[in-house]
Amino acid sequence: MRYQLFCDGASRSNPGDASIGISILLDGKEVHTISKKIGIATNNEAEYQALIDGLNYCVDNSIKEIEVFLDSNLVVEQVNENFKVKAANLKVLNSKVKDLIQEFNFIEINHIY
């Protein structure tokens, strides 16, 4: 069964108070959501943290096949290795995502608008 993971992160200013939102669906039905404040972060850090938290939930719940959707083109392209990760703070987060990706039998990271 292939799940869908929708992730979003936002920062009130850049950096500033940040929050993340995650929704996990199976067959079009929402099975889990996460919404929380993450402290002070940039928009890109928040986007990465949403992805990390969503992937962690999937790993912890033995979800092995997933399609991921984010509205951050930067994060999608960096994770898919089409863009270089230049910022040191994002390199750490990108590395965490790469480690988590290894836990899946199938994973696809997509950009949505």
Model-flagged regions — what are they?
Residues 46-50:
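Loop-to-helix element that buttresses phosphate recognition and phosphoryl-transfer chemistry
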Residues 10-14, 52-113:
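RNase H catalytic domain
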Residues 1-45, 56-60:
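RNase H-like nuclease fold core
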